[in-house]
UniProtKB/Swiss-Prot annotation:
Organism, scientific name: Bacillus cereus (strain G9842)
Protein name: Putative pre-16S rRNA nuclease
SUPFAM superfamilies in the cross-refs: Ribonuclease H-like
Subcellular compartments: Cytoplasm
Lineage: superkingdom: Bacteria
One function term, GO molecular function aspect: nuclease activity
Length: 137
């Protein structure tokens, strides 16, 4: 059973995939999207779901520090609902507070250059989100 983890932003979607046992998350790719034009990367996500035989998708839910959900969180909830309808899969929302900061710290501690960090930060945030979900099981 593989699980896909997504960090949905305004310009990109970071993608992570679990191993078949559901123990570890690994960064897969970053999908460029354009919300204004209605391009959300659903075609590519659908391809990945088929290619890796995904059973479940975990979408990061950006909450405010006080636990409330703002406009970005609402957009992510709508993204998840659209995926659920399109792919007919279980789509779970997962609190992603501070996931990007955690990913940034991991990359800095690994001595990754600023330029390279910018290229992989969304994918790493998806790893942090998915690994948090996997660790909770």
């Amino acid at each position: 059973m593989r699980i896909l983890g997504l960090d949905v932003g305004t310009k990109t979607v970071g993608v992570a995939m679990s191993d078949e046992m559901g123990w570890t998350a690994q960064g897969l790719e970053t999908i460029k999207i354009n919300e204004e034009r209605g391009h959300f990367g659903f075609d590519r996500i659908s391809e990945l779901v088929k290619q890796y035989n995904v059973d479940k998708i975990v979408v990061g839910l950006p909450k405010n520090m006080n636990g409330t959900i703002g406009p970005r969180g609402e957009a992510c909830q709508q993204f998840a609902e659209n995926l659920r309808e399109l792919l007919q899969l279980d789509v779970v929302m997962w609190d992603e507070r501070l996931s990007t900061m955690a990913a940034e710290r991991l990359l800095i501690s690994a001595d990754v250059s600023r330029k390279k960090r910018k290229q992989v930060i969304d994918k790493m945030a998806a790893v942090v989100i998915l690994q948090g979900f996997l660790d909770s099981k």
